[in-house]
Amino acid sequence: LKQNFSISLPQAMREEVGYAVKQVSDEEHKELSPQWVYEIFEENYVNNTPYFTVESCHFKQNDGIMAETEINFGGKKTIVDANGNGRLDAVSNTFKQFFGISYELSTYEEHALSHGSSSKAIAYVGITCDGKNYWGVGMDEDIIKASIHALIVAVNKLPQIAQNESAQDERLTSMLNYIQNNYQDVTLESIAAQFHLSEP
């Protein structure tokens, strides 16, 4: 991958990618061409978002960075807000909030794929959940977009996402967004009025 496509995998990711390639090689009973190796890599780590995608993502300064992420899951689009230390952390927190999951951002690496003003960047994101690593890769001229795509692929691999046919109740997500957007003056009474709940 490095020699033919300038892809320099993080050390911690190499064994898993090698295993995926070896599995195909063993099944086909032959050595794979560089292009075939790249296609296996792309299928497993770049174009692999079977459960959810992100339609859009916007950021603003708010006690760090706030991400407004539009998540497309099960054919439904939901906007989720969350804060983080940086853009990737903020987007990661929208996923944790929406799906009700927990994981750690364990590895982040990036490098240019080619030289020049219009060169693409590649980002590698590794997350850890229950002691196991999950990897995703993104490529884009915008390194932030590449990073977010890599995170989306990694989170799609979590077993909890596959099992989670319906995400948390949309009404709960709406309440969390309302509280976050009005955190300075939110009260139980205002939440009750906004969401037609019985008075506390």
What are these regions (language model features)?
Residues 2-162:
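Terminal or standalone catalytic/regulatory effector modules within metabolic enzymes
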Residues 167-175:
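N-terminal positioning helix adjacent to the helix-turn-helix/winged-helix DNA-binding module
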Residues 175-187:
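Basic, amphipathic alpha-helical hairpins
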Residues 185, 189-200:
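Basic/polar phosphate-binding segments, predominantly the helix-turn-helix DNA-binding elements
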